[in-house]
Design a protein with these regions (language model features):
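Catalytic-histidine neighborhood of serine endopeptidases
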Residues: 24-33, 51, 74-120, 127-128, ...
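C-terminal cap/linker of serine protease catalytic domains
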Residues: 24-31, 39-46, 208-290
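A conserved glycine-rich beta-strand in the N-terminal activation segment of trypsin-fold
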Residues: 37-44, 56-83, 105-110, 173, ...
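Catalytic nucleophile loop of clan PA
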Residues: 71, 192-213
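C-terminal, low-ordered peptide segments at domain boundaries
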Residues: 126-148, 264-267, 278, 355-367
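PDZ/PDZ-like domain segments forming the peptide/carboxylate-binding groove
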Residues: 140-144, 190-195, 199-200, 273-320, ...
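Flexible, gly/ser-rich surface segments that form the specificity/activation loops bordering the active-site cleft
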Residues: 144-183, 218-222
């Protein structure tokens, strides 16, 4: 699991209970309770079906070994090849890969490719004569038959399946809800632990809605005399999975590339300006007078910058990216997570040039 630096806030709450001594005249009777049996049966049915397409991933090199989880997303009948999606950090630095099906059954696997930026990797395997008996029991989560319009909403039930803390805990089910939805990642309170990485996150219809990636960790340090010690505290109820549209795009790129997929960078720093929180911002004179409160301003460039070479200037305000309005920094991040170095990006920017306000459309290339 990857580590994240998290700000820590302590607070206290006071619960007040108000009681009345007067008689209760109006009693609300709940006649239609939720049919929890149907929900439980749905979870059971989904698990029985999709878990047959969830596998363990065993990896090793000459100096280390580890394990994670994965999901079978495709089977090619002509070549008898199964395709498994997992996390890039599960296979990173490893040279040997195996797929685990439970009940002490393994199959050797090959690395088709990976996308380190988005933490996605694809493995392939074939069933040999020793494992051919499990072919009929395997399930393929055909994610490319799903509509891209399927939305994930806060409060939606999430089923996560994986191998937490090792392959001995094969296909363990945990449940929770969607806590928040970002452009590339979705947070959930479903229990996620080391070993869950690369496992599937499903909805109550049994559709894969993402690939489990990490659990949030609060990293802090303590000074004791002349010594500084650091510690990590896992944050319960704060796990993340990669959104399905990002996963699908990565898989397409990996299958085309058959190797490492490199994502480009604009080579610039973009600062988010909120004029309500910071009305006297130093960028104030560079912002358009359009009634908005949040802006994204180019504040600096890297030594090698595709954006600068293609005409972006310091203090430019980013308005659109590929024809879509930029409403959050996630919009920029999502664009960069789905393009390759062979692609180009269209930017619309607002700038003040020699005292004149103007809007420019620029094309960023990365070659």
């Amino acid at each position: 699991m990857r580590k994240k630096l998290l700000g820590f806030i302590l607070g206290s709450g006071l619960l007040l209970s108000v009681c009345s001594c007067s008689s209760v005249k109006n009693i609300v009777k709940i006649s239609d309770e939720a049919d929890y049996t149907k929900i439980e049966n749905s979870i059971t049915d989904v698990y029985e079906r999709v878990s047959k397409g969830c596998v363990g991933v065993s990896v090793s090199s000459s100096t280390q070994s580890g394990s994670g989880s994965g999901v079978i997303y495709k089977y090619d009948e002509s070549s008898k090849t199964y395709y498994v999606v997992t996390n890039e950090h599960v296979i990173s630095g490893m040279t040997s890969y195996s797929i685990y099906f439970g009940n002490a059954k393994y199959s050797s696997a090959s690395l088709l490719g990976y996308d380190a930026t988005n933490d996605i990797a694809v493995l392939t395997f074939h069933l040999d004569i020793l494992n051919n008996d499990i072919k009929d029991s395997l399930y393929v989560n055909d994610i490319f038959s799903y509509s891209d319009n399927d939305l994930v909403s806060v409060g939606q039930t999430v089923l996560t399946i994986g191998c937490p803390l090792g392959l001995s805990n094969f296909n363990i089910l945990t449940t929770g809800v969607v806590s928040s939805v970002e452009a590339t990642k979705i947070s959930t309170d479903s229990a996620i632990n080391p070993g869950n990485s690369g496992g599937g996150a499903f909805n109550l219809e049994g559709r894969l809605i993402g690939i489990v990636e990490e659990k949030e960790v609060w990293k802090y340090s303590t000074t004791r005399g002349n010594y500084i010690t650091s510690d990590d505290t896992p944050i319960e109820g704060r796990g993340y999975f990669i959104a399905l549209d990002i996963v699908k795009n990565c898989i397409k790129n990996i299958e085309t590339r058959k190797g490492a997929v490199e994502r480009p960078s604009f080579g610039m720093t973009v600062t988010t300006i909120n004029t309500i929180l910071d009305p006297n911002t130093s960028f104030k004179d560079y912002l358009p007078d359009d009634g908005k409160n949040v802006y994204f301003v180019v504040s600096s460039f890297d030594k090698v910058s595709a954006a600068k070479e293609c005409g972006v200037k310091t203090y430019d305000v980013l308005l659109e990216i590929n024809g879509n309005s930029i409403n959050s920094s996630d919009d920029i991040k999502k664009c960069l997570s789905t393009i390759t170095k062979n692609d180009s990006v269209k930017l619309k920017v607002y700038r003040i040039n020699l005292g004149k306000k103007e809007t420019k459309e620029l094309t960023i290339t990365f070659n």
